[in-house]
Each structure stands twice: as C-alpha cells, then as structure tokens.
Amino acid sequence: NSLHSAFSTYGEVLESKIILDRETQRSRGFGFVTFSTEEAMRSAIEGMNGKELDGRNITVNEAQSRGGRGGGGGGGYGGGRGGGGGYGRRDGGGGGYGGGGGGYGGGRGGYGGGGYGGGGGGYGGGSRGGGGYGNSDGNWRN
C-alpha cells in the first residue's frame, strides 16, 4: 500500500496498518508503521514530516511509549478528514495517535490500553504480526 511504500524508503518496514472504521470500513484517518530499527524510524520522521501522502499533509513525530520495551521503532499516521490529523511514531512498540482523537497502541508482545477519541473506540497493537482494533465494549478483532 502507499503507506508501506512511502515509509520503506527510510528502512525495513515490519508492519504497516491503516485503521478502518468498524461500521463503514473506511479509513479513520490514521495508521501505524513499525520499523526494524530506531534509526529508520528517526529518518522517516525527518523525511516525512509535513509531506503529502494520499493527498493529505501529514505530521510525523514519535508517539509516547507506555512501558515499551527496547527494539525496533514504529508509529502511526493520521491524515484526518478536513486536513487534520497527526502522525505518531512508536519506539519499541509504544503507540500512536491521529485524527482529532488520541490513543495509545500496545507494544510488541502485549496490549497497552488506550482509546481513540470521538466514538469511544480503542486500538491496541500486539506482537509484530498482530494488532487489532475494536470499540470500548472489549470486542477486539484484527
């Protein structure tokens, strides 16, 4: 996908995921990218901040880790409807935020709680191949 292609320029991308709305299956305006190294993550932050992706200007930064472990960097981006959004980067599996909401993703090897504003949804990333999205009633799916 375009997210993977745009960021693979900066290093090995382990996973890229665009978060979809549960009801409409349309993009919620943000996603996550996980790199194999922190160096690749930092290069992508510098190279992509303020750039256009799929017709939207994105903001790129490192997201806050919640008890994250060491390891590869990653992140998420938000294009947002109406030009909003943010790009969250995670270091060692922290989390990301995007759109007008906020929220934290899980780290590698576990779930880190959090929510995405405006509708009570939550997003939790899992191990490298995992990750999931769901609403606040605790029903999660990949």
From Swiss-Prot:
Regions of compositional bias (Gly residues) in chain numbering: 67-101
Region (Disordered): 48-101
Disulfide bonds: none
Entry-linked SMART domains: RRM
Recorded GO MF terms: RNA binding
Domain of life: Eukaryota
Keyword entries, A-Z: RNA-binding
Residue span, RRM domain: 1-65
Gene3D superfamilies: 3.30.70.330
Function statement: Possibly has a role in RNA transcription or processing during stress.
The name this protein goes by in its record: Glycine-rich RNA-binding protein 1
Organism: Sorghum bicolor
Gene: GRP1
